[in-house]
């Protein structure tokens, strides 16, 4: 995913957190903030230290990014959102991560209306 699609700055993360607009399932928490004048969505990925060791956290982040790349054309473009992995996400296969992440994104209404 291109750098322009990522949220990297701490201040941007905090701005999205402070909206308190979140949904969750058992594996992921999604925070979102509408940005009407934005050309495309931006995403921040957070995998805390409770989620395994550094190798496992990197593995989970890569799987989340890959899933987002696969569903990118279907996502709303005028939003910033954060994906926070819960501890149980470390034990999932790629297929399970995709299923759970798509479920969380659906709960957050981040897919374009058909």
Curated annotation (Swiss-Prot):
InterPro entries: Ribosomal_Su5_D2-typ_SF (IPR020568), Ribsml_uS5_D2-typ_fold_subgr (IPR014721), RNase_P (IPR000100). Consists of a catalytic RNA component (M1 or rnpB) and a protein subunit. Belongs to the RnpA family. It comes from Limosilactobacillus fermentum (strain NBRC 3956 / LMG 18251). The gene is rnpA. This is Ribonuclease P protein component. Disulfide bonds: none annotated. GO terms for molecular function: 3'-tRNA processing endoribonuclease activity; ribonuclease P activity; tRNA binding. Keywords: Endonuclease, Hydrolase, Nuclease, RNA-binding, tRNA processing.
